[in-house]
Amino acid sequence: MGSRFRTTVLLAALTALIIWIGGAVGGSHGMMIAFVLALVMNVGSYWFSDKIVLAMYRAQPLSEADAPQIYRIVRELSASANLPMPRVYLIPESAPNAFATGRNPENAVIAVTEGLWRILTPDEIRGVLAHELAHVKNRDILVSSIAATLAGVVMILARMAQWGALFGGGRSSSDEDSGGGMLGLVVTAILAPIAAMLIQLAISRSREYLADETGAAFSHNPESLARALEKLAMASHQNPMEDASPSTAHLFIVNPLSGRSLANLFSTHPPIEERIRRLRSM
């Protein structure tokens, strides 16, 4: 199953989960409200997600005068990928990492931490930037924003189901089998958030493999990205980002939380070893 098809299936599963929860909480009217809520939140995510994440990490525009090598690499890769030149931002963070954001290629941003160019060679930096441009090319930022937003809607509806179970609400409260309806609300409140999280993680992991493959094609050097991933993974374990948020961890090229034991239980990224193996088999 291809990465794009798998992502489509998983997004459809998240949407179906939202509609199902809406039905469990409020019947046909609940299903409609759930759908509208998901739509409204997705529109907001589309327009404002990039501004929010850049502000979260105190990222500032990086001028070409301050980083001519970064700009030269990004310009060359953008031309190779047939993409507009993205804006480049700097994150004041010693842990080496990078991410891309923006609702479309015309509004794309690549953000790199101060620690990135301290430990990587120019070829390895090129591999990282190619990976981030691959996310832009594949519209992964839009996909991940939609997935995160839909997962947020699931959490809201699951909380509604929880309150419905506590206070005897739900569409089955007036039916003969009200106990079954109550049980359905309890099951929904417990399992729906877990299902949403697992689907979101599956989407994120699928898109990382695709970005590795596409980025290696842009740079014509999969080995440079493989070496960069090895260094970044080791640095992330030794020095995880202090201000990294679980809600945005999926944006980074390597998991910024990987040094924290609880974060490894449900990683937003596929195993580094498998990513490196795939790159070196290209």
From Swiss-Prot:
Annotated localization: Cell inner membrane
Required cofactor(s): Zn(2+)
InterPro entries, sorted: HtpX_protease (IPR050083), Pept_M48_protease_HtpX (IPR022919), Peptidase_M48 (IPR001915)
Cellular component GO terms held in the UniProt record: plasma membrane
Topology in membrane: Multi-pass membrane protein
HAMAP family assigned: Pept_M48_protease_HtpX
Official protein name in the record: Protease HtpX homolog
The organism of origin for this protein: Syntrophobacter fumaroxidans (strain DSM 10017 / MPOB)
Classification of source organism: Bacteria, Pseudomonadati, Thermodesulfobacteriota, Syntrophobacteria, Syntrophobacterales
Name of the gene encoding the protein in the UniProt record: htpX
